[in-house]
């Protein structure tokens, strides 16, 4: 299910992001993010899985770690708390408002880009996607009501758990041996569908 088209789209948006940073116009990226919020209302968090430059580079880092056999640390329990994501979001909003009031440009997006990539070297991707990324927290709100999302067909699912294992955002949940995908946390990255041997997972 995951294909070359997705990779091409990710690389194109990553290149655009880098160009905006180099030319000092990274603030224009917010236009794409606002589009991502609008799209999330219907199509879930496709911004995260297909457009976000942070996620694209994190995928590359994870691939390198896997090839080199580098073991990742577990997500620190102190950070794996539901309220952490909202605390980070509050700090993000406060920084944004401060920037507007003072007129001083604060490189929030480049800083988040660096933090997300660095954390991936040491911890699972879910730490960033689920708890620390303020953009992801914002997108999780409209995504919770999205019509189209990744779904597990229960008639095909054999509860092998591979989808839960490969999900970078820990969006796959288990309730009485039944696997489901929490659409507010799902990145629509297609990793689960790509690894499902039963072909039980689809975007619909």
Cite the ranges covered by each PLM segment:
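Conserved N-terminal phosphate-binding loop of PLP-dependent enzymes in the Aspartate aminotransferase
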Residues: 171
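Non-ligating segments of multi-cofactor redox enzymes
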Residues: 1-166, 175, 184-187, 191-194, ...
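Minor-groove-contacting beta-hairpin "wing" of winged helix-turn-helix DNA-binding domains
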Residues: 180
């Amino acid at each position: 299910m995951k294909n070359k088209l997705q990779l091409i789209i990710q690389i194109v948006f990553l290149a655009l992001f880098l160009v905006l940073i180099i030319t000092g116009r990274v603030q224009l990226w917010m236009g794409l993010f606002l589009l991502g919020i609008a799209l999330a209302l219907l199509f879930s968090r496709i911004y995260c899985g297909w457009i976000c430059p942070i996620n694209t580079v994190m995928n590359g880092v994870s691939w390198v770690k896997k090839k080199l056999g580098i073991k990742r640390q577990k997500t620190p329990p102190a950070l794996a708390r539901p309220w952490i994501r909202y605390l980070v979001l509050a700090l993000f909003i406060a920084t944004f408002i401060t920037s507007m009031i003072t007129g001083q440009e604060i490189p929030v997006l480049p800083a988040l880009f660096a933090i997300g990539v660095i954390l991936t070297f040491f911890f699972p991707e879910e730490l960033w996607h689920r708890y620390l990324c303020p953009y992801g927290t914002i997108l999780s709100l409209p995504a919770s009501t999205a019509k189209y999302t990744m779904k597990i067909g229960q008639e095909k699912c054999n509860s092998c758990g591979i989808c839960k294992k490969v999900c970078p955002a820990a969006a796959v949940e288990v309730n009485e041996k039944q696997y489901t995908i929490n659409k507010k946390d799902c990145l629509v990255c297609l990793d689960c569908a790509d690894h499902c041997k039963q072909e039980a997972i689809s975007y619909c």
